[in-house]
Amino acid sequence: MRLNDSPQVEHVIAQDIDANRSLDWDNVILACGPCNRTKSNRQCPPTTHYLPEYHNTHLAFDYFVSSQKNHGEPAAYIRPHQQYIDIVKANNTIDLCALDRDTTRTFDQATDLRWKYRFETMVRALILRDELEEWPYINLHGFIKFLKMIVEATGFWSIWYETFIDVLEIRRMLVMDFAGTDQHSFDSTTFLPIPRTPRHAGDSI
């Protein structure tokens, strides 16, 4: 999977808060540079934030899939009508890494290019979605193999999943063929997202 920024080691509990935990395996995660810089030394335990190591974050967050450069549209927002989402925890997560940051107004000077990369991927995803719709007799198996190569080259798994969410065979490919995708976060038959921690009432994702 393509990485647009050099991965950095991020500490859930910052080193200047508890240096003794700086090498603890359960205290480190991979993060992109802009996310890491934005987080700084703020703590983000799974009790107050949604983390992909513990939660099915695809259920908590969404962003507009659009080919139009409208201000803010590619930014993350909390999925509506999800009664099991902890709104405070979701907002904490968005704020932690500035997932809703809109860099369109300062594009020429921006150093945080997450918006640019997301937008470019959205355009590609929508083009390929149109291709699938316009070719009713397309070889779906061949299309899926081609699509997998594109997803591997561009990244942004969630954009591709959301764009093709109504195509079962593509959902299956995205869930089953990408290493690191948590199998417990998706139904084993429909490959639709499901709560990852259903035992936790009020915060099951």
Language model: regions and residue ranges:
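Histidine (H) residue identity feature
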Residues: 11, 49, 55-58, 71, ...
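Detector for the c-type heme attachment site
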Residues: 36-37
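Histidine-centered nuclease catalytic patch
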Residues: 1-30, 42-59
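C-terminal, charged low-complexity interaction regions
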Residues: 91-205
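Intrinsic-disorder/low-complexity coil detector
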Residues: 44-45, 51, 73, 135, ...
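Short Fe-S-cluster ligation motifs
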Residues: 21-33, 58-82
